[in-house]
Amino acid sequence: LVAVKSFWGHLRKGRIVILSDGTLTTEDRAVLAWHCGNPEIIDIADVDHNGFPAGGAWERFLSILDRRADDYVIQLDSDTVTLGRPDVVADAIAANRSFTLLGGPEWDIGVRTCTDYVPPSPDNPGEARHIQSRMERALAQIEGAGHHGYIRGCAGFAGFARGGNGRETARFFHDEMARLLGHQAMAEWGSEQVTSSFVVANDPDPVLLPYSQYGNYWAEPWDADCRFMHFVGAHR
């Protein structure tokens, strides 16, 4: 509720759609109806995977892609707080441009082609094995890599412009990564985030949110002009 009401209260537009994991009680739904304006609630069991992985936030992502033909859709994680008016986001919506929160300040470099993108060097073997690292190392090998873009974004806060091609771009990327890394790899937690970043990067003229105003919290002070914070991992 903090995530939704802080964002909705500052943006002052839009309607709420909630993906339920199946545990919402009647009382939960009544609270959400009161605070969120009778939101549409999607049962996770009703999402059609159609060859995409189950779990790992894929149902959320697929639900967004299925709705963007007619609406501008924003993914908002529950571990976020909007601290001020999100003007860059409001402008992106008005211009019908997709946007994404960045993975860190070092990624404020613009979209790179999949052949030009240089993934960060892992700090330890665990990072090297992480699905995001493996997928990013494989980017240059996808079909037509030089004609596709990528940015290391964060799926916790991303906007998808109205009128997109639904699941088409995500399907292409998923299938290419499954070919290169295996279908089991694409079921690992984190594969959806890389796919989300790929989809945003290949939408027309995407907006990369300035990290000083829209960031991830790592127990460090944020700028006075910070508008949005994503509290990741142990910092939730």
Predicted regions and their residues:
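Short, acidic, metal-binding catalytic loop of nucleotide-sugar glycosyltransferases
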Residues: 6-14
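Short internal beta-strands
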Residues: 15-23, 102-103
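The conserved acidic donor/metal-binding loop of glycosyltransferases
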Residues: 77-81
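Conserved donor-nucleotide/metal-binding helix-loop-beta segment in metal-dependent transferases, i.e.
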Residues: 82-121
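A glycosyltransferase accessory/donor-loop signature
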Residues: 130-236
